[in-house]
């Protein structure tokens, strides 16, 4: 069968357009001078919505150079300040660590289904200082701290038993430790935004979209409306 013929075959999965976005609108009067302020408002509204069970979930996308291959994964956003959005992870062995080491550009997306809203952020990444990483690490459950030591994230392992054995070894290693230290390869990464888009779903896919842009962190924000 030719490639063209394959493309005309019935798809394995077909998702017809049935869902309508019809709850809210977004217009110029609702915008703020600083997009961080509008994001904070939207995020707090998502937190207060009982149907948004994990408002801090994000899609984090990075790209390795020189290949340009993009990788994405779901992570949990942890901190926000006026410089940017911070996540925490293994920066020694993970796929995203390799990507960021070759290309500091990254993007994150928040999607709140019940509120029919999406926020897309593009920017430059930077590692937070050690003090900040250790401060956050102390708030993690003990099991998660041990897990950070046990797992060389994204390395190939033989089976689940290997991971369980490493976890047990580190559980024994730190059994007398009141405070488990933060590994030197583990810490925070801040995405300093250069572009933040606010998307509000509207009927017939005629969504409201506004994007804030700046060339560098020190430049003022400019905002424009985009066609849906």
From Swiss-Prot:
This protein's UniProt keywords: Flavoprotein, FMN, Isopeptide bond, Mitochondrion, Oxidoreductase, Pyridoxine biosynthesis, Ubl conjugation
InterPro entries listed in its UniProt record: Pyridox_Oxase, Pyridox_Oxase_CS, Pyridox_Oxase_N, Pyridoxamine_oxidase_dimer_C, Split_barrel_FMN-bd
Cofactor(s) annotated in UniProt: FMN
Pfam families: PNP_phzG_C, PNPOx_N
Reactions catalysed according to its record: pyridoxamine 5'-phosphate + O2 + H2O = pyridoxal 5'-phosphate + H2O2 + NH4(+); pyridoxine 5'-phosphate + O2 = pyridoxal 5'-phosphate + H2O2
Binding site for FMN: 73-76, 88-89, 95-96, 118, 153-154, 199, 209
Chief place of localization: mitochondrion
PANTHER family: PYRIDOXINE-5'-PHOSPHATE OXIDASE, PYRIDOXINE-5-PHOSPHATE OXIDASE
Name of the protein this chain belongs to: Pyridoxamine 5'-phosphate oxidase
């Amino acid at each position: 069968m030719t490639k063209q013929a394959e493309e005309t075959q019935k798809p394995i999965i077909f998702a017809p357009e049935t869902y309508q976005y019809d709850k809210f609108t977004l217009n110029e009067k609702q915008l703020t001078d600083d997009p961080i302020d509008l994001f904070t408002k939207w995020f707090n509204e998502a937190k207060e919505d009982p149907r948004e069970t994990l408002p801090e979930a994000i899609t984090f996308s990075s790209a390795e150079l020189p290949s340009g291959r993009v990788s994405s994964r779901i992570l949990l956003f942890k901190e926000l300040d006026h410089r940017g959005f911070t996540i925490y992870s293994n920066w020694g062995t993970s796929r995203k660590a390799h990507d960021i080491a070759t290309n500091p550009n990254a993007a994150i997306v928040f999607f709140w289904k019940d509120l029919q809203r999406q926020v897309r952020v593009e920017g430059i990444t930077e590692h937070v200082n050690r003090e900040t990483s250790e401060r956050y690490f102390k708030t993690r459950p003990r099991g998660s701290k041990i897990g950070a030591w046990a797992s060389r994230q994204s390395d190939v392992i033989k089976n689940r038993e290997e991971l369980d054995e490493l976890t047990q070894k580190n559980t024994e290693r730190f059994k007398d430790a009141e405070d488990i230290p933060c590994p030197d390869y583990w810490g925070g990464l801040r995405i300093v935004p250069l572009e933040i888009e606010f998307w509000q779903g509207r009927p017939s896919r005629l969504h409201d979209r506004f994007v804030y842009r700046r060339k560098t962190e020190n430049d003022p924000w400019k905002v424009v409306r985009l066609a849906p």
